[in-house]
């Protein structure tokens, strides 16, 4: 714990400007999450080259693409339990280095089974990152900063989705090999893992770059959280009686149902329904997801500023989540009826801008579970969300197959966005004092 040894030293420390180590840590987490999504996208981009090389049937291609998501989803709860038991810093560093290794090892695949194994390993290794972000959100940020912290961690999803296809395809075109592209992506991920391990600390008091002003800002802002941490670990049976937990799981499932549904099916929708070629489709997809990234940052800033003004957490969060999801629902509904391609892309940009405000869901595990249960709650929330993310692309495929159009697929997304508003209104966003 940092201390000052004399009144003069204390006065000097108080006069010094506050360091900003906490925000550098969350920028690193943004980088890790973006890399997370770039590495996920690598197989999708390289599949047209990999499929003929390994003689993959369409069914085998689907298996290959889904392998990551199944292992990623199934490891969310175990990953959260590990974070509650062991040091967050070490798990982040080890997980990032491991997923970089699996990404690079994919280049050595001599048949589809080996490549499948590397994708399963990639999902396992990436699984602790989002719950780890929720854990650090609770220990490094004050209640009035957690919205921005949550959207920095979650903002890597739209940012990585926007950049992934462009970067991986550019590497393949430049190097003339999907294998070399996988190696470079893997090595870059490993270097990011080393950076994260060297800079991140579990608690502000452990970081050499945190000065007295920043440490005092964090500890005083989290006085109630520290008081809760001093108590015994909250029994899970107590948490399971809290309606907010199940509403949080359901709400986040609907968020990822919309996001993953658009992520997987929007390019095909723009190509088949609106006639965009591959180049135009890529540009539109990049624009839509970049709007999501910008929206996520702006939403977190608005939420924190509103909280800092003295507004109650329930008012801020319910209005932010419900309002943004209903605006997104209205835009997607409009896209279902509008025929003009430019108008459709604009509506989807606005929808993605607002739906990503819900990235602030990642501050909820620390609020509801307290320091002792943030990891397992964050892992369970991400498990529920990613199971929806696994199932929704299949559901949308069946809808399109049986109806022959994308209209009812868009209506499905509208319904999911409305349900985000419903479930978000059922959550109590006040700090828990068990």
Task: Go through each PLM region and give its residues.
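Extracytoplasmic gate region of multi-pass secondary transporters
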Residues: 43-44, 240-299, 358, 362
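Helix-breaking motifs and short loop linkers at transmembrane-helix boundaries and internal kinks
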Residues: 55, 87, 102, 108-114, ...
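Conserved MFS/SLC helix-loop-helix module at the cytosolic interface between two early adjacent transmembrane helices
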Residues: 74-113
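Structural signature of the two symmetry-related core transmembrane helices
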Residues: 90-104, 314-333
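Cytoplasmic helix-loop-helix junction between adjacent transmembrane helices
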Residues: 118-158
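Glycine-rich segments within core transmembrane alpha-helices of 12-TM secondary carriers
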Residues: 148-166, 173, 292, 296, ...
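Helix-loop-helix hairpin linking two adjacent transmembrane segments in secondary transporters
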Residues: 153, 157-207
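A late C-terminal transmembrane helix in Major Facilitator Superfamily
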Residues: 366-405
């Amino acid at each position: 714990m940092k201390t000052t040894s004399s009144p003069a030293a204390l006065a000097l420390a108080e006069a010094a400007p506050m360091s900003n180590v906490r925000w550098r840590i969350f920028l690193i987490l943004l980088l890790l999450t973006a890399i997370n999504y770039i590495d996920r996208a690598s197989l999708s981009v390289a599949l047209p080259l990999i499929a003929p090389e390994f003689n993959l049937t369409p069914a085998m291609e689907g298996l290959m693409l889904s392998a990551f998501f199944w292992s990623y989803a199934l490891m969310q709860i175990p990953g959260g339990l590990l974070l509650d038991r062991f040091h967050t810093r070490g798990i982040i560093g080890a997980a990032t280095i491991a997923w970089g290794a699996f990404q690079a090892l994919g280049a050595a695949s001599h048949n589809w089974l080996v490549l499948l194994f590397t994708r399963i390993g990639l999902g396992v290794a990436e699984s602790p990152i989002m719950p780890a972000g929720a854990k650090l959100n609770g220990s490094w940020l004050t209640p009035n900063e957690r919205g921005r912290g949550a959207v920095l961690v979650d903002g890597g999803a739209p940012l990585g989705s926007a950049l992934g296809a462009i970067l991986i395809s550019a590497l393949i075109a430049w190097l003339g090999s999907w294998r070399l592209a996988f190696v470079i992506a893997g090595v870059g991920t490993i270097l990011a893992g080393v950076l994260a391990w060297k800079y991140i600390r579990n608690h502000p008091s452990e970081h050499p770059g945190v000065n007295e002003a920043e440490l005092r800002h964090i500890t005083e802002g989290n006085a109630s959280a520290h008081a809760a941490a001093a108590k015994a670990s909250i029994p899970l049976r107590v948490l399971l009686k809290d309606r907010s937990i199940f509403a949080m799981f359901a709400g986040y499932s609907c968020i990822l149902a919309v996001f993953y549904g658009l992520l997987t099916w929007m390019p095909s929708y723009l190509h088949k329904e609106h006639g965009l070629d591959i180049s135009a489709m890529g540009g539109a997809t990049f624009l839509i997801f970049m709007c999501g990234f910008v929206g996520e940052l702006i939403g977190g800033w608005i939420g924190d500023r509103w909280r800092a003004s003295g507004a109650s957490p329930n008012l801020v969060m319910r209005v932010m989540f419900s309002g943004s999801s209903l605006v997104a629902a209205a835009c997607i509904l409009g896209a279902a009826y509008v025929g003009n391609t430019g108008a459709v892309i604009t509506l989807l940009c606005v929808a993605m801008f607002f739906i990503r405000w819900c990235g602030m869901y990642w501050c909820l595990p620390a609020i509801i579970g307290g320091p002792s249960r943030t990891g397992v709650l964050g892992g369970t929330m991400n498990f529920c969300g990613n199971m929806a993310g696994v199932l929704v692309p299949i559901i949308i495929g069946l809808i399109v197959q049986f109806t022959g159009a994308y209209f009812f697929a868009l209506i499905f997304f509208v319904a999911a966005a409305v349900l985000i508003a419903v479930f978000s209104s059922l959550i109590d966003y006040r700090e828990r004092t068990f």
